[in-house]
């Protein structure tokens, strides 16, 4: 077709061997301008059809709109003005020896700088004036450089010879070899294309696609033969020539220009002779693909081969075109774009006037237009490469845009910005617009195959034709793809001017070509891309062209090349092909134009001659819709010449193109004759293909457009990158889009695609709207979504493989675009953080690739090596079972009886072990005997105070159960009135305070005796009446509430702390009463006098203020769990009349909720008026209790807590009764009106009513006087008068327990403390909480009560419940529970309600030897009363004792038989494996419970004789007697905590202080103390306690008298004595060995439980306290890998082995005891172990009853080792052993020195060495060891 103008201008020499043309012998230099001759003659066209066809002359140049004031100084004839340095030579053709030089136009034409010259007009001028032969070179890619050189030096255009015969043959061959053509096309572009060629090719492709889409039908017919010929003959030469052209690029540049003159008539005749076999112009083979697929492939090659070599037959006539350059016409007014004005013939004449006349006046524009009516003209443009294109001003640009009234295209989908688009060349625009045209050109390869003359004609035709096309796009601009608006308008103007003025267009084209030498390559590349894109779709071609444009802009090579467009025209079948010149803006930005050889890429040389084909976007789309056009780009690089021109040739006029043709009728009138000819030849084909297109458009319509919208653009970009990587030596690589090779029938497919594109652009506006300029700004991600919606399956698409890959790329790009869009508003810092996180995640993923991905369906992967590891080689580890990972299907199995259960016959046990749930009530005599037993076990416990209270509570509970039993049936009935009447009747009884009645028993011992007697009688008489089954009812009341203390006197232990709390609450009560009186007085005074008594008020206020300042409103109670903190608060509050609001850890207690619930209660003291509910506690709860579902079918006997009494349900409430406001939110909404008696009765719940009835019964039982009721009423009235109004008290339980939901809890507590007018009590079990919690509060410390008293208390409870228990069991239980009263009581309830323990026959145990005969009792009268019944004692049947409470707690009954005692199990000799396993299991259980069973009970389980040493002062020895009472002992415990209320040490305690431990006891557990350590009586160092005991006890004294040390020397030992000593030492050695082993185990195996205690155990030896939070990190992690169970098992095994060895050794040693006795020497006394009574009673763990001595020792240790001198010591146990004895000796010595008063001023030794130990500690060290 049309050869590249730059190549033609460069006049690259044709290879001599191929074309028989003499090579150029001299390379034109920049300064070699003398050779340029002015074209003085015109070669008149053969036919005058051009005159007929072309419309009246119009301004041919778009520069008319942008032209600035002409520069008179510029003279077109001056050659010096255009001197430029030679750009790097670029070979245009593939032929190795392109030696025919091109004669460049005369220099005077190119001296006009900054003037746009239309190429076609220049060609016309050249033709007419100078008839200088223009040679069209076949060089493809690298001829551009040569062209540029030639153009710089010469002003003559030489047309290449083209051989018609060869073309005909090549066409036939091309039919046979269409596929080879495409494959070669693929190869050639890579080898022989420069980057400029790439750009040109892309542009051409698009222009050709747009122009060709309509001409496809005709072009197909023509292209099939032509392509064949081209393929067969030119494919190989093109490849070889491309390689040669690369190698000989410089040689071609150096060759002199040789002109081959061909008679134009002969050329046209020969051309017409071979219509079907169109002359394969050097560009033709490259430009003409047999099918769209080939076209695409050949696009790149065709671009390169734009100047394909002419076939070797060079005898064809040469066409010599003489063109004269005309001066540019006068500047027109810029206001009205001349594109809309039809130019008249005079304008044409003016444009054709002699350029010399007008040169000095203004810029010259010359359009050389060669008009051939039926032949396609090859426009040969020459220009001076030196000229640079001036940029138009903003005004001109805006005017141009306004003229077209089309918004500038937004950034295209390929990402180009507006500024880039502004710089785009018209060629680029035309490329975009010419997507369809380029496709059409590809489809019409015949158009591309044009002889040199045909190319000139086609140029003329193109110059005239764009006008027609430009009109169409204007009308349908919205539907067409457009590049920059300015470029579009320029293209349109150029087209119109081309129609009007062929000559002018020729001149302009020549000037433009001069301007755009360097852009030849660019246009080639663009057109090549267009060709490639043509196959895919017009849209893709647009995108690719844009990419190429960007590349061409970015790389500006100052080469000016002459572009010669060759078109082989099959007779008149081919219509005008309008070639537009590239956009001037792009020319300015990048100076390397590229010529596109559209169609066949086989003959790359021919590609050079093919003009750049592009179309304006509108024209492109309209042409696609209605007509197929061949668009050729005429590039002009000269500043003084017109901008780029597009030449369009309309191939066919399908039906669809009627509208567009009508719109452009005015412009097409002159071309009608040629159109008719073209239509006549291609009418049938076009119709047939239209039908095919329409049929398949419905199927493939949407999919193609989708595919070509974005993906191909990106694919072209990626391919361009890959091409650059492959050919780094080339600046701009040709982007080759390879599609699957197509057969000869592929033109139909390409037509189908184009037709489909027409449908998309014309009919389916929603799809084509993506290309509308106004919508260019839409992000590609949104466009992609639309395309996905419109997706239709694609059928028979050549580029389907490309689309699939490009769609995936598009998805990635869309995702990135979406992410970038969403992150566009983020700050940089956040972006960096996100990027850093993403990078870290990538690194982590990369690192973790070796690990299996976690899948929640099946974690195990059988193929993974990790699941098939080899078994370990260790023989001990090879016996593991195989891991069975198979999941069994349970549905397949039928569960049968016995499969998961076994039926074992229960062995007949002792009938004594039968479980019984209920027991008969004890008789009076039995109860008294058991009370005597309890009294003897612990004489210090006051039975007279606790037993009556507990018994009354039990009777009350029984009556409650009876009341529930009576109301069981009415409860289930829906009748409310009946239940209400019953409640009222029950509630009418006198309401006496429980506390008052309970206190009646403590009025005096005499009253208590009488009442207990009466009570015993009553119970004994009613044993038959009271059904024992009533206890079997479901008991909903815990014993901790059932036996809850109602008075402060009922509490056990902590007497001082309770008194302090009671006094504090009493002060608050007094303060509240004073404030209440003040308020009442103020109101009365206001009512009566209206004026307050100032003096009284001020006095009262002052007193109240003083009291308020004195009183702290908050008390913090600390102490271990279960010692009675909360019970003490409730007891004191109930005694003093406080209403308690409890907030415990069981409810959600966030700060906001607490403040909202309690804000009313915190503002006043009084919270309730006088009434029944005044003393009921209120619990903080988030949930509405009244709305909770009621148990309708609850058991008959349900007993609830008297303290935590839930509100009655609506069903059980009366009509006038409202729900009790238990929730704090509703509490303050209670009406303040006083209730009548009926209302009070109605407000009482069932439980309350029953309780009152039970109280009434108890009153009747306890009081027999007739006026008892009146007295009780008086008492109640007095008590209620004291508590008219309940004072509020808020209680926060467990303030140290804070959950995640309790946000702001402590802050809310602090707010209450700061703002409330009521007392606040906080309880906590954390001793360090007071250090962490900030605030003003008083601290009250509760400690562990006396273990013996608690044990006696539990025995009394069991006695009240009709159970006889063993005191030793309770001591053991409390020892295991750390004396937790609540826990022990709850477990006791569970144990008793489960049936109790093992029943054993056991006589009464008494503390005296003579207790069997007479019961020694205390001074209580009750005991005297029992003594009076002494004669009946022998006749009373004592109940059997329930034992095994502690064993049941530890589950030992499951290990040993129920009847087997634990100590018997330990003493039993192990003979079987089962027994050994039992022993290990028992020891393990105790180790898990942190109990050292063997060490604690060693003296009992060893086979040594044991002697229990009773103390003279009591059954439990000295430590018990020192505590005259439980309160005294508790005083010792709380002395160091309650500093403000110190207790004096009892004198007895001071007198009896003894040193009973040596230093070895310092590192014991602290629970053991010296008197309880196992010690052999013959020990050399006897303790003081033992000496005292021997002195006091005559029996012990006589036994051990022989072993007392004597001052006199003893006689030598006899044989018997030696033997006895050996026996004793052997036993001692065994025992010491066992202790050594135990010590080693303790050191080796650390207790895992200690590490879980937040590390506090590490600080127990110092005074330091660990604040909460400092050791939290250790709480979640166990450093010791040994689990508690494993560590316990290991320790138990070692301990059992060691103990078994020790026991067996001692047993063997004792076998020789008889032999010693035979020698009249009995070592039994020496082997006997003396054990105190309390040590003997305790089991499992040594008693914690008296911890004073241990506490004193620990206090000394903490004080000493907390000083700075000892803080750095490591092992604390070793430090204690090393330092403490020495420090004690020093302190004693210093104490003696101080007493002797040797010096006037005594300086202690520790002060001299600056050892900072407190004076109190020094005094303690100097004293005897505690």
From Swiss-Prot:
UniProt entry keywords in alphabetical sequence: ATP-binding, DNA damage, Isopeptide bond, Nucleotide-binding, Nucleus, Phosphoprotein, Ubl conjugation
Glycyl lysine isopeptide (Lys-Gly) (interchain with G-Cter in SUMO2) crosslink location in chain: 127
LXCXE motif (motif): residue ranges: 1415-1419
Keyword Nucleotide-binding applies: yes
Feature: compositional bias, Basic and acidic residues: 243-254, 418-442, 459-468, 487-505, 1006-1019
Family: Belongs to the AAA ATPase family.
Name the record gives this protein: ATPase family AAA domain-containing protein 5
Protein species of origin: Mus musculus
């Amino acid at each position: 077709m049309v050869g590249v103008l730059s190549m033609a201008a460069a006049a690259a020499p044709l290879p001599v061997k191929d074309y028989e043309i003499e090579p150029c012998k001299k390379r034109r230099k920049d300064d070699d301008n003398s050779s340029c001759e002015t074209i003085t003659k015109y070669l008149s066209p053969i036919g005058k059809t051009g005159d007929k066809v072309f419309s009246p002359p119009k301004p041919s140049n778009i520069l008319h709109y942008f032209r600035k004031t002409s520069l008179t100084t510029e003279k077109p004839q001056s050659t010096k003005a255009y001197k430029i340095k030679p750009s790097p030579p670029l070979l245009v053709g593939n032929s190795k020896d392109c030696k025919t030089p091109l004669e460049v136009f005369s220099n005077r034409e190119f001296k006009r700088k900054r003037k746009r010259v239309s190429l076609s007009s220049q060609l016309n001028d050249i033709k007419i004036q100078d008839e200088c032969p223009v040679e069209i070179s076949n060089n493809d890619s690298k001829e551009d450089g040569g062209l540029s050189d030639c153009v710089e030096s010469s002003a003559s255009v030489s047309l290449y010879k083209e051989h018609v015969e060869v073309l005909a043959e090549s066409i036939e061959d091309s039919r046979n070899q269409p596929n080879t053509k495409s494959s070669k096309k693929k190869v050639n572009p890579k080898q022989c294309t420069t980057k400029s060629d790439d750009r040109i090719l892309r542009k051409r492709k698009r222009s050709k696609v747009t122009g060709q889409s309509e001409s496809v039908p005709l072009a197909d017919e023509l292209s099939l033969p032509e392509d064949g010929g081209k393929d067969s003959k030119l494919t190989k030469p093109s490849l070889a020539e491309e390689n040669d052209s690369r190698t000989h690029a410089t040689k071609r540049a150096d060759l002199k220009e040789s002109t081959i003159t061909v008679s134009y008539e002969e050329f046209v005749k020969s051309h017409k002779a071979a219509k079907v076999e169109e002359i394969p112009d050097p560009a033709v083979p490259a430009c003409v693909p047999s099918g769209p697929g080939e076209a695409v492939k050949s696009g790149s090659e065709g671009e390169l081969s734009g100047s394909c070599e002419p076939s070797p037959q060079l005898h064809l006539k040469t066409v010599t075109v003489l063109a004269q350059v005309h001066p540019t016409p006068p500047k027109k007014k810029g206001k009205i774009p001349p594109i809309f004005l039809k130019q008249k013939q005079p304008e044409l004449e003016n444009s054709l006037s002699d350029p010399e006349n007008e040169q000095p006046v203004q810029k010259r524009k010359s359009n050389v237009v060669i008009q051939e009516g039926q032949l396609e003209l090859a426009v040969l443009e020459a220009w001076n490469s030196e000229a640079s294109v001036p940029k138009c001003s903003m005004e001109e640009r805006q005017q141009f845009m306004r003229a077209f009234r089309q918004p500038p295209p937004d950034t295209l989908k390929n990402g180009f910005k507006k500024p880039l688009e502004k710089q785009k060349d018209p060629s680029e625009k035309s490329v975009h617009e010419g997507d369809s045209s380029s496709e059409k050109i590809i489809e019409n390869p015949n158009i591309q195959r044009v002889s040199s003359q045909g190319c000139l004609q086609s140029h003329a035709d193109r110059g005239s034709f764009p006008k027609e096309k430009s009109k169409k796009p204007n009308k349908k601009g919205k539907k067409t793809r457009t590049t920059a608006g300015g470029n579009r308008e320029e293209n349109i103007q150029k087209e119109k001017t081309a129609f009007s003025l062929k000559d002018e267009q020729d001149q302009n084209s020549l000037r433009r070509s001069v301007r755009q030498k360097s852009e030849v390559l660019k246009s080639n590349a663009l057109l090549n891309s267009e060709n490639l894109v043509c196959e895919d779709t017009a849209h893709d071609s647009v995108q690719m062209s844009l990419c190429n444009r960007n590349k061409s802009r970015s790389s500006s090579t100052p080469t000016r090349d002459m572009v010669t467009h060759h078109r082989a025209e099959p007779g008149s079948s081919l219509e005008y092909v309008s070639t537009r010149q590239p956009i001037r803006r792009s020319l300015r930005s990048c100076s390397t134009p590229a010529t596109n050889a559209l169609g066949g890429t086989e003959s790359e040389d021919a590609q050079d001659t093919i003009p750049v084909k592009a179309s304006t976007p509108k024209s492109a789309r309209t042409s696609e819709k209605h007509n197929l056009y061949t668009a050729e780009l005429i590039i002009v690089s000269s500043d003084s010449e017109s901008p780029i021109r597009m030449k369009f040739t309309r191939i066919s006029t399908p039906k669809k193109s009627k509208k567009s043709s009508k719109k452009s009728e005015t412009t097409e009138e002159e071309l009608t004759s040629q159109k008719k000819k073209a239509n006549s030849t291609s009418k049938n084909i076009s119709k047939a293909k239209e039908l095919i297109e329409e049929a398949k458009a419905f199927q493939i319509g949407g999919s193609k457009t989708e595919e070509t919208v974005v993906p191909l653009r990106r694919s072209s970009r990626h391919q361009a990158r890959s091409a650059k990587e492959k050919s780094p030596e080339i600046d701009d690589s040709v982007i080759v889009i390879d599609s699957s090779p197509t057969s000869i029938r592929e033109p139909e497919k390409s037509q189908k695609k184009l037709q489909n594109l027409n449908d998309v652009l014309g009919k389916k506006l929603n799809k084509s709207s993506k290309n509308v300029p106004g919508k260019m700004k839409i992000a590609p991600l949104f466009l992609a979504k639309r395309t996905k919606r419109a997706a239709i399956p694609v059928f028979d698409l050549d580029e389907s493989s490309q689309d699939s890959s490009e769609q995936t790329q598009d998805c990635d790009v869309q995702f990135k675009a979406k992410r970038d869009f969403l992150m566009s508003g983020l700050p940089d810092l956040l972006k960096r953080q996100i990027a850093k996180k993403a990078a870290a995640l990538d690194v982590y993923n990369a690192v973790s690739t070796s690990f299996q991905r976690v899948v929640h369906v099946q974690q195990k992967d059988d193929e993974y090596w990790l699941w098939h590891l080899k078994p370990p080689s260790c023989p001990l580890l090879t016996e593991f079972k195989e891991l069975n990972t198979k999941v069994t299907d349970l549905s397949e199995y039928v569960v049968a009886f016995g499969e998961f259960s076994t039926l074992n016959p229960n062995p007949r046990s002792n009938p004594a072990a039968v479980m019984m749930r209920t027991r008969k009530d004890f008789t009076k005599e039995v109860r008294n005997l058991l009370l005597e037993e309890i009294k003897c076990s612990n004489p210090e416990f006051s039975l007279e105070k606790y037993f009556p209270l507990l018994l009354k509570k039990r009777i009350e509970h029984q009556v409650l159960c009876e009341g529930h039993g009576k109301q069981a049936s009415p409860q289930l009935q829906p009748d409310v009135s009946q239940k209400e009447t019953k409640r009222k009747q029950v509630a009418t009884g006198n309401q006496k305070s429980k506390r008052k009645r309970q206190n009646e028993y403590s009025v005096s011992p005499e009253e208590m005796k009488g009442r207990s007697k009466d009570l015993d009688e009553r119970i004994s008489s009613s044993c038959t009446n009271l059904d024992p089954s009533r206890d079997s009812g479901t008991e909903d009341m815990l014993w901790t509430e059932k036996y809850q203390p109602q008075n402060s006197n009922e509490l056990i232990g902590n007497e001082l702390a309770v008194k302090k709390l009671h006094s504090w609450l009493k002060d608050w009560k007094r303060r509240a009463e004073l404030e209440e009186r003040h308020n009442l007085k103020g109101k009365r005074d206001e009512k009566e006098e209206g004026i307050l008594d100032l003096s009284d008020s001020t006095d009262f206020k002052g007193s109240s203020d003083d009291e308020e300042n004195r009183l702290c409103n908050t008390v913090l109670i600390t102490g271990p769990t279960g010692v009675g903190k909360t019970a003490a608060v409730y007891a004191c509050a109930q005694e003093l009349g406080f209403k308690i609001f409890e907030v415990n850890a069981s409810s959600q207690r966030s700060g906001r909720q607490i403040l909202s619930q309690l804000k009313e209660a915190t503002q006043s003291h009084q919270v309730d008026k006088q009434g029944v509910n005044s003393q009921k506690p209120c619990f903080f709860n988030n949930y509405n209790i009244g709305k909770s579902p009621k148990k309708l079918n609850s058991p008959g006997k349900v007993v609830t807590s008297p303290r935590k009494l839930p509100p009655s349900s609506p069903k059980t409430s009366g009509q006038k009764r409202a729900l009790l406001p238990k929730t704090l939110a509703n509490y303050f909404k209670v009406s303040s009106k006083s209730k009548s008696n009926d209302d009070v009765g109605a407000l009482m719940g069932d439980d309350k009513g029953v309780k009152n009835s039970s109280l009434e019964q108890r009153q009747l039982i306890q009081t027999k006087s007739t006026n008892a009721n009146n007295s009780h009423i008086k008492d109640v009235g007095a008590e209620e008068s004291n508590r008219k109004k309940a004072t509020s008290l808020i209680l926060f339980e467990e303030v140290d327990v804070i959950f995640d939901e309790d946000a702001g809890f402590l802050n809310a507590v602090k707010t209450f403390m700061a703002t409330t007018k009521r007392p606040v009590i906080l309880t906590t079990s954390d001793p360090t909480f007071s250090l962490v919690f900030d605030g003003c509060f008083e601290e009250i410390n509760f400690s562990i009560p006396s273990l013996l008293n608690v044990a006696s208390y539990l025995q009394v409870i069991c006695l009240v419940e009709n159970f006889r228990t063993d005191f030793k069991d309770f001591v053991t239980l409390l020892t295991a529970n750390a004396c937790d009263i609540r826990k022990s009581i709850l477990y006791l309830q569970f144990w008793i309600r489960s049936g109790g323990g093992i029943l054993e026959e056991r006589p009464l145990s008494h503390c005296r030897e003579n207790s069997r005969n007479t019961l020694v009792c205390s001074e209580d009268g009750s005991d005297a009363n029992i003594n009076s019944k002494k004669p009946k004692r022998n006749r009373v049947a004592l109940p059997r004792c329930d034992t095994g409470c502690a064993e049941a707690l530890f589950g030992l009954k499951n290990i040993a038989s129920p009847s087997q005692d634990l100590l018997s199990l330990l003493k039993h000799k192990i003979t079987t494996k089962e027994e050994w396993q039992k022993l290990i299991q028992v020891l393990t259980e105790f180790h898990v419970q942190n109990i050292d069973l063997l060490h604690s009970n060693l003296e009992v389980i060893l086979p040594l004789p044991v002697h229990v040493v009773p103390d003279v002062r009591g059954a439990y020895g000295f430590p018990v007697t020192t505590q005259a009472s439980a309160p005294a002992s508790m005083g010792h415990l709380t002395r160091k905590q309650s500093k403000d209320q110190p207790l004096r040490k009892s004198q007895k305690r001071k007198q009896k202080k003894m040193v009973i431990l040596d230093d070895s006891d310092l590192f014991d557990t602290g629970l053991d103390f010296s008197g309880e350590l196992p010690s052999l009586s013959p020990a050399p160092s006897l303790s003081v306690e033992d000496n005292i005991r021997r002195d006091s006890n005559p029996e012990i004294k006589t036994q051990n008298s022989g072993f007392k040390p004597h001052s006199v020397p003893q006689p030598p030992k006899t044989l018997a004595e030696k033997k006895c000593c050996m026996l004793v030492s052997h036993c001692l050695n065994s025992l010491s060995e066992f202790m050594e082993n135990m010590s080693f185990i303790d050191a080796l195996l650390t207790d895992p439980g200690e590490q879980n205690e937040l590390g506090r155990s590490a600080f127990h030896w110092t005074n330091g306290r660990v604040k909460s939070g400092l050791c939290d990190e250790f709480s979640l992690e166990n450093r010791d890998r040994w689990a508690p169970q494993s560590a316990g098992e290991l320790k138990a095994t070692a301990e059992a082995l060691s103990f078994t060895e020790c026991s067996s050794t001692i047993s063997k040693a004792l076998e020789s005891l008889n032999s010693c006795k035979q020698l009249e020497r009995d070592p039994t006394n020496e082997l006997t172990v003396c054990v105190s009574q309390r040590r003997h009673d305790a089991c499992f763990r040594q008693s914690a009853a008296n911890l004073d001595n241990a506490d004193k020792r620990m206090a000394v240790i903490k004080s000493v080792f907390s000083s700075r001198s000892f803080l750095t010591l490591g092992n604390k146990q070793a430090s204690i052993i090393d330092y403490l004895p020495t420090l004690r000796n020093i302190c004693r010595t210093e104490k003696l020195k101080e007493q002797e008063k040797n010096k006037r001023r005594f300086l202690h030794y520790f002060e001299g060495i600056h050892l900072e130990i407190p004076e109190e500690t020094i005094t303690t060290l100097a004293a005897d060891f505690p």
